[in-house]
Amino acid sequence: MIIIPARLKSSRFENKVLECIFGLPMVVRCAKNASLVDECVVACDDESIMEVCQKFHIKAVMTSKHHNSGTERCLEAAQLLGLKNDERVLNLQGDEPFLEKEVIAMLLEATKNAPFMATCAKVIDKEKAKNPNLVKVVLDHQNNALYFSRSLIPFLRDFDLKRPTPLLGHIGIYGFHNREILEELCSLKPCVLEEIEKLEQLRALYYQKNILVKIVQSESVGIDTKEDLQNALKIFNSLPTTP
């Protein structure tokens, strides 16, 4: 099951999930793309999102406006849907309308072997890494996340720039091995690191829970600001009306 948490009042770009992208609202494009891989549902926090989903025949459930994270919203949706405890759950951010279905499928498969949870990242250049809206991640020798940050990590002190630069940009999708793990993560007390960085995945690392990171090739652009949207529209200027 793929759950898309969709919040209307985004702090950096209000109503962004309803922004039109080549004929489709952003959240609808996310859902149509995800539904090519697995069953998909949108976890709404506002009637306007629900109405848009219904208009485009997208399955949706209404959740509380008071969740602190998309993960909490996904858990409520999973509970409302009555998902089995052993069912794998993907949390696809509602601002990833350009994420390739192949990447979603790869994460769904990788989640089978992840003891706790999994996510995706792609190689980025130093200029892109300077953007605090693009979250960076560093890994251990088994491709488990060591840390996520809005800062440039690792810091390239005296690094030979002729070598491949080990900079990885995080992609806004998470896979949970089963519903019970989703419940476990939400039961953990928020930590200071996630509050400082405003990155919910840091809670798992703080409590020593592994996040397996699948390195993928992707042209996807997460939409955090109006500028992101305008830049993305220039890049993806030939998308069809439906994914």
UniProtKB/Swiss-Prot annotation:
- Reaction it catalyzes: 3-deoxy-alpha-D-manno-oct-2-ulosonate + CTP = CMP-3-deoxy-beta-D-manno-octulosonate + diphosphate
Query: Is the keyword Cytoplasm in the record?
Result: yes
Query: Enzyme class, one word?
Result: transferase
InterPro entries found in the cross-reference section: Cytidylyl_trans (IPR003329), KdsB (IPR004528), Nucleotide-diphossugar_trans (IPR029044)
Which keywords label this protein?
Cytoplasm, Lipopolysaccharide biosynthesis, Nucleotidyltransferase, Transferase
Q: Its Enzyme Commission number?
A: 2.7.7.38
Task: Name any Gene Ontology BP term.
Answer: CMP-keto-3-deoxy-D-manno-octulosonic acid biosynthetic process
Q: Which GO cellular component term is one of those annotated?
A: cytosol
The metabolic or biological pathway listed in the UniProt record of this protein is: Nucleotide-sugar biosynthesis; CMP-3-deoxy-D-manno-octulosonate biosynthesis; CMP-3-deoxy-D-manno-octulosonate from 3-deoxy-D-manno-octulosonate and CTP: step 1/1; Bacterial outer membrane biogenesis; lipopolysaccharide biosynthesis
> What family is this?
Belongs to the KdsB family.
User: What protein name is recorded for this chain?
Assistant: 3-deoxy-manno-octulosonate cytidylyltransferase
Species whose genome carries this gene: Helicobacter acinonychis (strain Sheeba)
